[in-house]
Amino acid sequence: MNLDFIKSKIAAVPDFPKPGIMFRDITPLLADPQGLRKTAEAMAQELKNKGIQPTIIAGTESRGFIFGVALAEVLGLGFVPVRKPGKLPRATYSVKYDLEYGSDSLEIHQDAFKVTDEVLVVDDLLATGGTAKATVDLIEKTQAKVAGLIFVMELDSLGGREVLAGYNVSALIKF
């Protein structure tokens, strides 16, 4: 797999956005001509290894769009964007979730999925799990099934995996 390559392209930026935070910057990975493809291929291999066979991909705004579309292309699947409020033109479901500094919301179209869909959630980072859990809650409002969640990287110490207990969660790189 391409995990060493992927990890080598994620820059560690200390004290961003505030002192004491080690920010993991994916822009070098995206800037590399092979970065996005190798990441999507590694995600596809992880799904194959775990026997996860989604019928459609959901990506969370905004970096989940990047990796979600790339993975959808590799797997030959469709892609559904999970958006911030007010960005989708038709009837939506909305879920509010808590952040460390307040709250936010996510939305999807009410007709985004069929009840028979096996939805894979894709995002760049699993930290506290709040955004991922809100995305799962949105998908379940449509009566579709969550096949699993996959992330480029996971910050183990923040407990996101525990928030998603009961779901099939994968991360390519753990910090």
UniProtKB/Swiss-Prot annotation:
It catalyses: AMP + diphosphate = 5-phospho-alpha-D-ribose 1-diphosphate + adenine. It is found in: Cytoplasm. PROSITE patterns: PUR_PYR_PR_TRANSFER (PS00103). Keywords: Cytoplasm, Glycosyltransferase, Purine salvage, Transferase. The keyword Ion transport does not apply. One of its GO terms (biological process) is AMP salvage. It comes from the Bacteria. CDD domains: PRTases_typeI. GO terms for molecular function: adenine binding; adenine phosphoribosyltransferase activity; AMP binding. One of its GO terms (cellular component) is cytoplasm. The keyword Membrane does not apply. It holds the Pfam family Pribosyltran. InterPro entries: Ade_phspho_trans, PRibTrfase_dom, PRTase-like, UPRTase/APRTase. Belongs to the purine/pyrimidine phosphoribosyltransferase family. HAMAP family: Aden_phosphoribosyltr. Catalyzes a salvage reaction resulting in the formation of AMP, that is energically less costly than de novo synthesis. Homodimer. This is Adenine phosphoribosyltransferase. It comes from Francisella tularensis subsp. holarctica (strain LVS). The lineage of its organism: Bacteria, Pseudomonadati, Pseudomonadota, Gammaproteobacteria, Thiotrichales.
